[in-house]
Design a protein with these regions (language model features):
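N-terminal "mature-domain start" segment
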Residues: 25-53
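Charge-rich, low-complexity N-terminal segments
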Residues: 14-20, 27, 64-67
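Surface-exposed amphipathic alpha-helical segments
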Residues: 2-22, 43, 49, 162-194
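A short, polar/proline- and glycine-enriched secondary-structure boundary/capping micro-motif
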Residues: 70-73, 144-145, 175-179
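Long, compositionally biased interface segments
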Residues: 87-91, 95-112, 173-194
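Glycine-rich, often proline-containing surface loops adjacent to acidic residues and nearby aromatics
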Residues: 70, 131-134, 161-167
């Protein structure tokens, strides 16, 4: 009985914390509609996030924080991902996107998935769409940078493409729990629009 109540209490605290974070985000939401125009998805995030990179199939927004930054990237892919191969496919996709779009500080460096610590994989439903959630650690190939990431990949049956939205944090020697909570809260607001 105690354990059941602790789980219920813990979930209630998380739900209330998420509601409060959304309330604060909605005080000053962004007017940026690039994600909506490009991919047909709406994402609620604060106006303090600024676009870092915007290409034909990739959007990267960033918020500066003390000693680092919070990042959200979004892109679509046409790939054959199934329950049998999603954990390998997602990591390979992340690494190829990192090499293409997310450079490190040094020449020839770029973001990849850290393989030393096995990421966690989950099946999810978000905005009524089935998909996958991956939580793990990113690092920079050929440099010494790393941090946590959370990656959602959702199937859009209308376009027959996967929508990928990912949050990652770089804040050396800082507790990243609140940063990752903010990124996850923002990402879970994703909605398909016409």
């Amino acid at each position: 009985l105690f354990e059941e109540n602790m789980l219920l209490f813990s979930q209630t605290v998380k739900d209330n914390e998420r509601k409060e974070k959304l309330r604060r985000i909605n005080k000053s939401p962004t007017n940026d509609k690039d994600l909506k125009k490009r991919f047909g998805y709406d994402l609620v995030y604060p106006s303090v996030y600024e676009t870092v990179k915007d290409t034909a199939n990739f959007i990267w927004i960033q918020k500066q924080v003390q000693k680092g930054h919070l990042n959200i990237i979004a892109y679509e892919i046409s790939d054959n991902i199934s329950d049998k191969n999603f954990n390998t496919k997602i990591l390979n996709i992340r690494d190829s996107i990192g090499k293409l779009y997310i450079p490190g500080r040094l020449k020839g460096s770029y973001m990849i998935t850290e393989r030393a610590y096995q990421p966690y994989f989950y099946k999810v439903t978000l905005d009524g769409k089935k998909g996958y959630l991956t939580k793990g650690t990113w690092e920079v190939a050929n440099d010494f940078m790393a941090g946590p990431f959370i990656n959602y990949i959702l199937w859009n049956s209308l376009t027959e493409k996967w929508m990928v939205v990912e949050g990652f944090t770089f804040a050396p020697s800082m507790n990243k729990r609140d940063y990752m909570f903010e990124l996850n809260t923002i990402i879970t607001t994703i909605k398909k629009v016409n």
